[in-house]
Design a protein with these regions (language model features):
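Short beta-strand scaffold segments in enzyme catalytic cores
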Residues: 38-40
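DEDD superfamily 3′-5′ metal-dependent exonuclease/proofreading module
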Residues: 1-21, 26-33, 43-304
Length: 304
């Protein structure tokens, strides 16, 4: 097993109790596949360090994991890209497989992929892949391979021990963790691209953005992400709707009505000073949905 360490010439803005990590594996299923490379980035004594743990063959996995744990056990938090769905679960399974008494906690993770996915449509992103997100925010990389290509290259490396192949795999992983460090402030980066809604009174000042909604025959639910401001977990209950503020989310639930017009069209609507149609047969009237939700939310929260 090889450990490759590099001290960056720049000191990146990352909390001392937090590290970034990314893994490379021989496949997607941790039951049958192994971890062959873990890259981490962290700050130590005013220096930013990238360290990579590389398995020269698949039998090095346990040693790789042991060295990884020894390096990161004292950190409180971690940052990943799709780590909640892949990296964390994969590592934990392989740790258990090798009887290593350690577990990465998903609650300690900030998953940049999960956050960006909330705003995929609003940002007009075709894909939420790391390379797509990087390009969107003007971050470019040297490496030209993806995870699938990395698997095939590693198979060749194990057979040949060709250093050039190893360097290609290492560069791919290196740029994954390094570029994630450029996305640590992803909330601010996304915030600059959106037309936020602002709600303020003498008690608080919130900046929010609608991320998704659901509508059925009885209820319309709209969720907002809170970019800034404190709200003390506000809860508002009305005969026709409720507003729940919890952590960085505002959930608005509205009771709606269903009717049929003279031409047998099915209409979902809400009655305010006038009837506001929200869905006409299969056509969702998004403009009306957003206007209604924003009006109710802003009106209620502003008056608290």
């Amino acid at each position: 097993m090889k450990i490759i360490e590099k001290i960056l010439s720049e000191n990146l803005s990352i909390d001392n109790d937090t590290f970034i990590f990314d893994i490379e594996t021989t496949g997607l299923n941790p039951r049958f596949c192994k971890i062959i490379l873990i890259g981490i980035l962290y700050n130590c004594q005013d220096k930013t360090i990238i360290k990579q743990f590389f398995a020269e063959n698949e039998n090095d996995e346990k040693e790789l994991l042991t060295n990884f744990i020894e390096e990161i056990y004292h950190f409180k938090n971690h940052i990943t890209f799709n780590g909640l769905a892949f990296d964390i679960g994969f590592i934990n399974y392989r740790l258990k497989k090798h009887n290593i008494d350690f577990n990465l906690n998903k609650e300690d993770d900030f998953d940049i992929f999960k956050f960006v996915k909330l705003f995929k449509q609003s940002l007009n992103l075709k894909s939420c892949s790391l390379t797509s997100v990087e390009k969107y925010f003007g971050i470019y990389r040297e490496d030209i391979i993806n995870g699938e290509k990395s698997i095939k290259l590693y198979e060749n490396f194990v057979k040949t021990q060709d250093k050039n192949i190893m360097d290609i795999i290492l560069l791919h992983n290196y740029e994954d963790v390094y570029n994630l460090s450029k996305l640590i402030n992803i909330k601010d980066l996304v915030k600059e691209k959106l037309d936020l809604l602002y709600i303020s009174n003498e008690n608080y000042n919130l900046s929010i953005f609608p991320v998704n909604y659901k509508i059925n025959a009885k209820k319309l639910t709209m969720n907002y992400f809170i970019f800034s401001g404190e709200h003390n977990n506000i809860s508002i209950y009305n005969d026709n709707y409720s507003i729940i503020c919890e952590d960085d989310n505002i959930s608005l639930e509205i009771n709606i009505n269903k009717g049929i017009d003279r031409e047998n069209n099915t209409i979902l609507f809400y009655s305010l000073s006038k009837i506001i149609p929200l869905k006409f047969n299969d056509q969702v009237l998004e403009k009306n949905i957003y206007s209604l939700c924003n009006f109710l939310k802003k009106n209620e929260l502003h008056n608290i």
